[in-house]
């Protein structure tokens, strides 16, 4: 699940959930930013099991917005206008529980429509290469921001300090029309401290509604934070604890101590892997080969400590995947003893009652011992990834493709 917006020569790579990040739902992003002085439309969150009371809604007309952790919702039917309570009800029925982009819409935000004179764009993105923050402004925002001409996008990198970032916004905003420039600068002065205080990876307002009065309102808000900062971010920590269904991946990581993300509920290949970078590369390899991975996992073999609990838990999660047909184990071990790992794996497979075929690709220390353990369990061991993928294809009935 990669999220990115390409603004011609400026590309914002919205970090994937398994990059130790927490992608907030729009409603939560707006509620959090409102606490930092950001103007947002009045709205309410409605869940699948909520009793809907029209009297708690703000005055209409409204926007009905399905809540998923992804951009481009307007293009997939998750952002609709409503002029009446009946239209709201119809949209809620259509959106709640809908399967979209590998997940389900668990909640909908109903908020006031905003009558804007103009739609602009402002974003702040952590720039790992420079150690700074990239500031991006445009006088043209909205659903088709990717199509904005190059000369209307203004970007620069500044140090992660309030004064430096605000100054960067002011300098870039000189390139915008006067009324839009003033609104963008004002919004930037409030967004900068919010970005830093939240320890965010990305804060993006698109569109930033510029009003006839010269004021502004955040039409949509995208916030991605570093989930390693949760112990310092009480509001975010509370979200994870009280809304586990909405932030299941982050909740799992902080409860169990490793990264596990279901990337595609329709995925056919369960992955037992270690190393975040290698695991992401494997997912890319599978997709490029036309195969469908079910999950991302960085099991962190060093944390097993001779116990099967972590492996068993992961295998149970993978086994719950309705479409999963084969398990691919891909471990590149430096310090980890592959013989010991294989013994733990075989025990965990038995404990978790895994009945699907298992293909193992192992590289590293004590490989011969691993082979001796896996062979009696009927698990073929490969050291070459292509050979392992060929075995996976055969189990999926795709051996001749």
Predicted segments with their positions:
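ATP-dependent carboxylate/acyl-activation modules
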Residues: 21-205, 209-326, 363-401
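Intrinsically disordered, low-complexity repeat/linker tracts enriched for polar/charged residues
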Residues: 3-4, 8-9, 13-14, 18-19
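C-terminal hydrophobic structural anchor segments
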Residues: 323-364
């Amino acid at each position: 699940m990669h999220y990115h917006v390409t603004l011609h020569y400026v590309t914002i790579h919205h970090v994937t959930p398994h990059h130790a990040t927490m992608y907030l739902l729009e409603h939560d992003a707006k509620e959090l930013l409102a606490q930092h002085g950001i103007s947002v439309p009045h709205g309410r969150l409605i869940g699948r099991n909520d009793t809907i009371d029209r009297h708690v809604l703000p005055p209409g007309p409204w926007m009905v917005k399905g809540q998923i952790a992804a951009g481009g919702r307007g293009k997939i039917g998750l952002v609709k206008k409503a002029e009446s309570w009946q239209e709201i009800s119809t949209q809620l029925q259509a959106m709640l529980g809908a399967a979209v982009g590998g997940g389900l819409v668990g909640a909908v935000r109903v908020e006031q429509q905003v009558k804007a004179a103009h739609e602009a764009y402002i974003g702040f993105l952590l720039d790992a290469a420079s150690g700074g923050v990239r500031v991006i402004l445009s006088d043209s925002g909205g659903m088709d921001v990717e199509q904005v001409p190059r000369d209307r996008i203004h970007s620069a990198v500044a140090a992660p300090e309030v004064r430096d970032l605000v100054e960067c916004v002011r300098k870039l905003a000189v390139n915008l029309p006067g009324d839009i420039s003033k609104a963008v600068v004002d919004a930037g002065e409030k967004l900068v401290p919010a970005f830093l205080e939240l320890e965010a990876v990305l804060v993006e307002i698109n569109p930033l509604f510029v009003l006839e009065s010269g004021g502004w309102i955040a039409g949509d808000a995208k916030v991605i934070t570093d989930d390693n900062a949760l112990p310092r971010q009480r509001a975010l920590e509370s979200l994870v604890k009280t809304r586990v269904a909405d932030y299941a991946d982050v909740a799992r990581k902080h409860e169990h101590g490793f990264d596990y993300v279901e990337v595609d509920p329709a995925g056919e290949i369960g992955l037992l892997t270690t190393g975040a970078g290698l695991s992401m590369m494997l997912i890319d390899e599978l997709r490029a080969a036309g195969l469908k991975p079910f999950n991302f996992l960085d099991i962190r073999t060093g944390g097993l400590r001779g116990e099967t609990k972590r492996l068993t838990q992961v295998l149970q999660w993978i086994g719950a995947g309705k479409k999963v047909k084969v398990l691919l184990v891909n471990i590149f071990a430096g310090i980890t003893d592959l013989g010991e790992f294989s013994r733990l794996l075989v025990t965990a497979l038995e404990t978790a009652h895994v009945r699907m075929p298992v293909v193992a690709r192992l590289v590293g220390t004590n490989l011969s011992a691993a082979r001796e353990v896996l062979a009696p369990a009927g698990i073929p061991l490969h050291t070459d990834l292509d050979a392992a993928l060929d075995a996976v294809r055969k189990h999926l009935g795709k051996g001749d493709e």
